[in-house]
Structures are given as C-alpha cells and as structure tokens.
C-alpha cells in the first residue's frame, strides 16, 4: 500500500549537489531509494527544507544533515527547527539525522528533547549505501502502512486489489458510466478511485455501519477516543438526522423535553415525530440582535417547575424531564459552560443533548475546556453531542457524528439506541462519506489536531 500513496522522501543536505564525498554518498542513498520505488525531494538549503517540512504534509520520511551539529549552534538549530515543524502535523513521521558517530553527542540539554524525536542517526561513512537505504525504506514503509485509519485503510486496500463489483450500486465500479458519452465525462471528472470505492454493504471485509462491526466499528471506536466520548456513531445524512436518531432512541410520546428556543428545525421535527411535550428555554438577545446564551437560572429546578405549571398540557406533573437540548455554540458563535449545565441539570434531566453542529473542533484545544459536551463526565444525565463534521472539519457533505458520554448513573443502552439508528440510516451508505469521517477523526488526533486549531487562532 505504501507505494500507492506516492509520498516522497525529503533529503536536506548542504552537499546534496556538491562534488564532495558526503554529497556523493547522499546521492547514492537517494538513487537506491528511487530504485526501491520512492520519489526523492532533495534540497541543499536548511531554510527550504523547513518550508517543505512545514507545508508538504505528504512526506514518507525526512533525512537531514547533522554533521558538526554538536559543535555548531546554527546547524543544531537547523536540525531542531526542522524536527519541530515536521512533527507539528505528522507526529509519527520518521526523521533520520545524517552524520558521524559524534554528530549530536555534545548537543546541549535543551535540544535533546527534540533530538530524541529522531528515528535514528545514519552513519554516512560506516555502513554501506544499500544498508542505509534499507533502514530508511523500512521506516518509511512502516509509517505509511500505519498512517491510514481503520475504515479508510480497508477501503483503500479493497479498491487497490481491483475487486470486481458483483452487487449494487448499479454502475459496477464505474463501468456503466463508460458506456455513454455523458457517463464517460462523469467518470473522467470524478476518477476511478471514487467510483471503485462506491460499494455495497455486501462487502464483509469493510464491516457494517448498521451493526457496527469490522473496520467501521474500529473507526467509530477510534473517533470516540479522539473526541473524548464513550461511544461514537457515524451518520451519513447530516446532523438533522443525527438529532432525530438521538431523540427517537431516548424520547417517547408525552415525555417532557426542555428545548432551546434557538434550536435547529430538526429538533422541532424530532418533537413532532416523538410526540414529546416541549418546555422552551429562552435565550438572551442584545440590542444588536445577537443571540446570547440561555441564562443559567432557566435550567434551575424552580424554573423548570414554573414552565410545567404554566403549560396546560403539563400542569400538575412532576419536574422530571426526559431530555434537554441546548444549541452549543449558539448560531452567533457563543459557547456555554457545558459542565456547569450538566451539574445544574443533574437532578432534573435524564438525557442532555448538546447540538454542536458548528462546534466539532472544541475537543482539540484547551481554549474550549469545560465548554463542550464531551469534556468531563459528571453525575446526572447521559450526555449526547451531535456534530456536523462536514461543517467545520475536513469531511464530505452530510458527514456527521453522534458522541455519547455515559454518566455515573446512566449508561447508553446500545441495542435500544441502534434500533433508532437503523430506522434513520440508509442500508446503502455512501462509503466515501464514511471514509471522510474516519479521516477527519484521524486528522485531529493528538498534537496535530491542536496545531490545526491553533493555526486558525493565529490567523484570526
């Protein structure tokens, strides 16, 4: 699979084009790697190397000159700087230093944390060129083989094996489109991989979205870890459907529900479909028309009881609410203290639903700590968040997720939930959308995700 990705190897060495012994040695290593199927990006400039490492996010490996770096502070900073920019988005990218045995043993302590990120030190003048090239190739292959997240990896593997499509969809991996001029134009525009990977649920090695098995289950579990959830479910028809799944799994006719007046229309559809009785939470609004948050006192037991008493459909009922839904962030971009809402509703509500359609990035930067649904497990309600992954992360249109955080008192009944899930999810899911959810989750994993959010802060 590694050759299919066509990720090049970056070599940064001041003698890469020079008529020196070191230059000749580095060029021989590059030639050996090219014979092994790798493309090489060579540069003799440390500054250019840093630019490539920071902007080319499709590298298989980096080789960087480090001869004399232990005694030369400028050379050492070149190496350290390249390591830092490369690892910002690719924490597992293998980076080798090129030099002699004594290259970095005299480096100062403050540089050692970065130098310890090196995969290894290649001794240019002690080992043979084929041996050195094999060291690099093995590290690059290992990195690329482990790069893809589980479902996307399985989809790429299945498509790359050139399997025939003996099932739906009817275009048969794109073959049908090639049978007419307009279809041929469609095929050329979208490309063969897009069409060959448009598959049916009849491919068992890809798992089942409806049963949450195989690589799809692994992808959902990995996304749950990345977003801080106990359970995550991929949704292929947007957060409007994700919201309806949550409600149909948790709410029954005549249940009391607390509803943010500033909610999406899918919440209103959910009320109609379930037959629940809404009690509305009124958000604030300033003189400019900007919608602010719901005041905290709206969530108090006394306020909830007052809403019940004022509603002719609920008068006389106990103040026990099945589900509360809050739009977080608001449509004007203001976010709630989610943990405070959880605690305030702990004795009043069974299920708390944060509609975070425009807020899927919050889990990946400390700036938002405490202000998103999956942040902290609290006593009281079972917590759902619904994310329009396609709106603010890198995913195809309609790609959404449902995240669930169990509380100490309430855990998700997965079997019951899945009945509602299967009610709303197509039995012919679009695998490109699912793969984009898997990739969106993997992109935000670890320090790479934080760096993406920090970049938006810096640009703002």
Predicted regions located by residue number:
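Conserved acidic segment of CheY-like receiver
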Residues: 2-33, 41-42, 62, 96, ...
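Short alpha-helical segment
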Residues: 47-52, 241-242
């Amino acid at each position: 699979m590694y050759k299919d990705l066509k990720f090049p190897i970056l070599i940064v060495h001041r003698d890469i084009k020079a008529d020196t012994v070191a230059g000749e040695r580095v060029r021989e290593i590059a030639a050996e790697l090219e014979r092994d199927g790798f493309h090489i990006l060579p540069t003799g400039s440390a500054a250019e190397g840093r630019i490539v490492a920071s902007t080319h996010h499709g590298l298989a490996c980096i080789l960087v000159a480090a001869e004399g770096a232990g005694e030369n502070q400028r050379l050492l900073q070149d190496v350290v700087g390249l390591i830092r920019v490369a690892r910002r988005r690719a924490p597992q990218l293998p980076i080798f230093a090129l030099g002699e045995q004594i290259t970095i043993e005299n480096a100062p302590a403050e540089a050692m944390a970065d130098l310890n990120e090196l995969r290894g030190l290649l001794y240019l003048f002690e080992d043979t060129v084929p041996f050195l090239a094999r060291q690099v190739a093995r590290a690059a292959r290992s990195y690329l083989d482990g790069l893809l997240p589980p479902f996307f990896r399985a989809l790429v593997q299945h498509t790359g094996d050139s399997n025939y499509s003996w099932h739906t969809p009817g275009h048969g991996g794109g073959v049908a489109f090639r049978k007419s001029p307009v279809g041929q134009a469609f095929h050329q525009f979208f490309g063969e991989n897009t069409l060959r990977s448009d598959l049916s649920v009849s491919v068992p090695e890809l798992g089942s979205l409806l049963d949450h098995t195989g690589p799809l289950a692994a992808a959902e579990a990995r996304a749950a870890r990345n977003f801080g959830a106990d359970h995550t479910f991929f949704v292929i028809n947007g957060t409007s459907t994700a919201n309806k799944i949550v409600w149909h799994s948790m709410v029954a006719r005549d249940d009391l529900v607390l509803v943010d007046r500033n909610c999406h229309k899918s919440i209103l559809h959910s009320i109609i479909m379930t037959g629940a009785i809404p009690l509305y939470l009124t958000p604030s609004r300033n003189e400019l028309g900007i919608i602010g948050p719901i005041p905290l006192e709206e969530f108090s037991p006394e306020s909830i009881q007052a809403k019940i008493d004022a509603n002719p459909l609920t008068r006389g009922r106990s103040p026990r609410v099945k589900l509360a839904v809050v739009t977080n962030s608001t449509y004007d971009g203001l976010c709630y203290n989610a943990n405070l809402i959880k605690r305030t509703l702990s004795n009043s509500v069974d299920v708390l639903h944060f509609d975070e359609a425009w807020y899927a990035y919050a889990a990946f930067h400390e700036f938002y700590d405490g202000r998103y649904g999956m942040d902290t497990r609290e006593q009281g309600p079972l917590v759902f968040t619904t994310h329009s992954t396609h709106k603010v992360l890198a995913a195809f249109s309609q790609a959404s997720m449902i995240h669930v955080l169990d509380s100490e008192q309430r855990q998700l009944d997965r079997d019951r939930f899945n009945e509602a899930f299967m009610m709303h999810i197509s039995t012919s899911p679009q695998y490109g959308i699912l793969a984009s959810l898997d990739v969106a989750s993997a992109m935000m994993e670890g320090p790479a995700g934080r760096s993406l959010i920090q970049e938006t802060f810096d640009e703002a």
